[in-house]
Curated annotation (Swiss-Prot):
Organism: Lacticaseibacillus casei (strain BL23)
GO biological process: tRNA modification
Major site of localization recorded for this protein: cytoplasm
Lineage: Bacteria, Bacillati, Bacillota, Bacilli, Lactobacillales
Catalyzed reactions per annotation: cytidine(34) in elongator tRNA(Met) + acetate + ATP = N(4)-acetylcytidine(34) in elongator tRNA(Met) + AMP + diphosphate
Subcellular localization(s) per the UniProt record: Cytoplasm
GO CC annotation terms, alphabetical: cytoplasm
Name listed for the protein in its UniProt record: tRNA(Met) cytidine acetate ligase
Assigned protein family: Belongs to the TmcAL family.
PANTHER family, A to Z: TRNA(MET) CYTIDINE ACETATE LIGASE
EC code: 6.3.4.-
Gene Ontology MF terms in the entry: ATP binding; ligase activity, forming carbon-nitrogen bonds; tRNA binding
Cross-referenced InterPro entries: Rossmann-like_a/b/a_fold (IPR014729), tRNA(Met)_cyd_acetate_ligase (IPR008513)
NCBIfam families assigned to the protein according to its UniProt record, in alphabetical order: PRK13670.1
């Protein structure tokens, strides 16, 4: 069966995502669309507005055939690490083609990735503490490969290409033109809105009928929503009670940020105020949110490394076509396939220990078990 894969967050699923899945299937002439989707937490450093099962169900009803979870250890990372986690998971699923939407589909992403593979991406170019890492990285890209575009989906596509280049058997890259408004912009264009706009409408209890598939309007209205508003008290408690040595073990903790975070947390009443207190020219808001989330979830560098060394394929759901594909490849997959979560997987030394640790907050807030005993949606 011809397969095409996409890496997504679907935070939440909307008409632009339905278009993207249809384009991927059409352009790749694929029988099966496989999606590696972020679990309950997303790359911008916050809980997804709906849990992973709600978002997987929406995707399966609107173009995806198989949805596999991108665990928190890969989902809540900077672009290159996020891309590596998603690309390697798709490759492990036996996917032939990697499709992604971009502002610049005309670019030869594989060629650019090869140029960057020989460029020096460390050293003196990253020692300007008055600029973010991303700004300095863009300058290195421009010097090494003549890359001047900085559009977010272009940069993410480039991260996909670099991760794909590192595979033993690289997938075919299939960039296609994005439709509608930019990823983090707010607004609506041709009945396609950014995920940010959809979240804004949902949280304000405004109608999303024009910007999500019809069947999802009532479905979304019945679902528990999640945000930093619910998580901030947990962050505050962690920062007020954890030892500094404990905080230093958290993934992506660097350069004394544990001091800055613990010094500023007492006076902050919400996440927005806290981020303004700790913000500096060196770090983007997304970088700081990711670190704050890692602290809240106690996601240590050790947990991230263990997840990379012992990857799993946790299936969230499939259509009949997806099930047929899964049955045809399950004995040939490079990684263990998980279709039912047992208690031993969630134990402190289990293969889903970090996922379970992170998802327990979602279960506590929303009252819906996220892992134990759950089977794939069908």
């Amino acid at each position: 069966m011809q397969t095409v894969g996409m890496i997504a967050e679907f935070n939440p699923f909307h008409t632009g995502h339905a278009y993207a899945l249809a384009q991927a299937r059409k352009l790749a002439q694929a029988d099966v669309v496989v999606v590696v989707m972020s679990g309950n937490y997303v790359q911008r450093g916050e809980p997804a507005i709906f849990d992973k099962w709600v978002r997987a169900q929406a995707a399966l009803q609107h173009g995806a055939d198989l949805v596999v979870e991108l665990p928190v250890t890969g989902a809540v990372q900077a672009a290159d690490q996020f891309a590596e986690a998603g690309v390697t998971a798709l490759a492990a699923m036996g996917v032939n083609t990697l499709a992604f939407g971009t502002e610049h589909p005309e670019v030869a992403y594989a060629d650019l990735a090869e140029k960057l593979a020989t460029a020096a991406l460390t050293g003196d170019g990253f020692r300007d503490y008055t600029q973010t890492y991303a700004t300095q990285l863009n300058a290195v890209y421009a010097k090494a490969a003549g890359i001047t575009q900085t559009d977010p989906n272009f940069m993410l596509g480039l991260s996909y290409a670099k991760a794909n280049l590192a595979l033993k058997r690289p997938m075919t890259l299939l960039p296609f033109a994005r439709r509608g408004i930019g990823h983090d912009e707010v607004g609506i264009q041709a009945n396609i809105a950014s995920a940010s706009t959809v979240r804004e409408y949902l949280r304000a209890d405004q109608s999303v009928a024009a910007i999500v598939p019809t069947e999802l309007v009532d479905f979304y209205a019945k679902q528990q929503q999640y945000s930093w508003a619910q998580f901030f008290p947990w962050l505050k408690y962690r920062l007020q009670t954890a030892e500094l040595n404990e905080l230093r073990l958290v993934a992506t903790m660097a350069e004394g940020l544990e001091y800055r975070f613990t010094q500023k947390i007492d006076d902050a009443q919400d996440m927005t105020a806290f981020l303004k207190q700790v913000k500096s020219k060196r770090y983007t808001y997304a970088r700081l949110r990711r670190l704050a989330l890692a602290i809240t979830l106690n996601m240590t560098a050790t947990a991230v490394n263990q997840a990379r060394q012992h990857p799993q394929l946790h299936v969230l759901g499939f259509t009949p076509t997806g099930r047929q594909y899964l049955n045809s490849v399950k004995h040939d997959l490079d990684w263990p396939l998980l279709t039912k979560v047992s208690a031993d997987m969630l134990a402190p030394d289990g293969v889903l220990a970090m996922t379970h640790r992170a998802d327990r907050l979602i279960t506590t807030i929303g009252g819906v078990e996220q892992n134990y005993g759950r089977r794939p949606l069908m």
